[in-house]
Regions:
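Short helix-loop-helix/strand-helix junction enriched in hydrophobic and basic residues
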Residues: 7-14, 22-43
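Charged/polar low-complexity intrinsically disordered regions
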Residues: 42-257, 261-262
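Charge-dense, extended regions
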Residues: 192-344
Length: 344
């Protein structure tokens, strides 16, 4: 019997028997019938097929596929205590454990694959280049590096591609948590500070971090927490966002140092980051290439922050209780507490 003569319910099962995403795409493009049938494929099946093509087509692995799919598991877990515990357990095994968690509970659509693949060239790679100029080889190649060439010289072992995806993953994971603080009247659920900190603790390898249950980082040269802490505290990071805010949101926006910065400015920067890939388009894409949808969303975020009467509450961490972390997503201070081992 010819393939296309099979009943529709049988054709719908075909994607589950394919070996990878290339076979899926080739079959879907072979004729209109299969294209229409494959359009109904479950997101979990598409993610499994994409995983079978990694790392050849989705690198760096596993960060790229985690960035593409982690919002789906965040949505699945948010507001459910038992599911949030499973998510935190996944964090504690590192990024590969989080990847496995995404495969088990998450999913991808073809549109999301296309969107993320395009974002690699328009957003992720340009962001990686900017981070390399803040903390990587380009930064350390600045003339007179140790003698005034940069304002914050340091010795860092930085993988800029990995760092870009790590902060994008954070935004994709906790974007809806920020929405809860932008819309306080709606009483939306959010992940708490501890859950957010555990992402940094376990999913960013660092040889000086105590949060390494299997000892895998003991003799490594990973410094991912230290690197991201440096980036998020740096003046270049603030200036990058300030330039985008002036371009798209407020031509009169000014950039002060962290001590003098109004809480709304920091919250705006964090809230744009918490849009994930969409938010980073503001700083990574050329101004004329930023989608209008991303600009409109950013303006809505700005307006909601301006409408807030007071900043979100904070909690203090550390032995002396001197490290404040906002109850709203606060990546700079969360990774700072994680790196400084102030839990003990």
């Amino acid at each position: 019997m010819p393939l296309l003569d099979l009943p529709l319910e049988v054709l719908l099962l075909l994607p589950s028997y394919l070996d990878n995403i290339e076979s899926f795409k080739n079959a879907a493009s072979s004729c209109r019938t299969l294209r229409n049938v494959f359009a109904k494929t479950l997101p979990s099946t598409i993610l499994r097929l994409a995983a079978a093509s990694a790392p050849t087509f989705f690198s760096p692995h596993p960060h790229f596929l985690v960035a593409a799919s982690v919002r789906s598991v965040s949505d699945w877990a948010l507001g459910h205590e038992d599911r949030t515990k499973l998510l935190r357990d996944a964090f504690r095994g590192g990024v590969y454990s989080l990847y496995t968690f995404c495969l088990e509970y998450g999913g991808l659509t073809l549109d999301r694959i296309r969107e993320t693949h395009l974002a690699r060239f328009t957003t992720i790679n340009p962001l990686s280049d900017k981070l390399d100029k803040m903390a990587g080889e380009q930064w350390m190649s600045t003339p007179d590096f140790w003698d005034g060439g940069v304002s914050e010289p340091n010795t860092l072992y930085t993988d800029a591609d990995r760092a870009a995806l790590q902060i994008i993953i954070y935004g994709e994971l906790f974007g809806r948590s920020m929405e809860a603080f932008l819309n306080p009247a709606e009483s939306l659920p959010s992940f708490d500070i501890i859950t957010r900190q555990e992402y940094f603790m376990y999913c960013l390898p660092d040889d000086k971090s105590p949060y390494d249950p299997d000892g895998a980082m003991q003799f490594s040269y990973y410094e991912d927490q230290r690197t991201l802490r440096h980036i998020l505290k740096s003046g270049r990071w603030r200036r990058m966002w300030a330039a985008a805010i002036r371009e798209f949101l407020d031509p009169k926006f000014t950039d002060e140092n962290a001590a003098a910065e109004d809480w709304r400015k920091k919250m705006l920067r964090d809230a744009l980051l918490l849009q994930g890939i969409a938010g980073f388009r503001l700083v990574a894409c050329k101004p004329g290439d930023v989608p209008e949808k991303a600009i409109t969303k950013a303006r809505q975020v700005r307006d909601r922050i301006l409408a807030l009467k007071e900043p979100p509450r904070s909690q203090t961490f550390g032995k002396q209780g001197t490290s404040p972390v906002s109850e709203a997503p606060d990546p700079q201070n969360e990774v700072n507490v994680s790196y400084r081992r102030q839990w003990y």
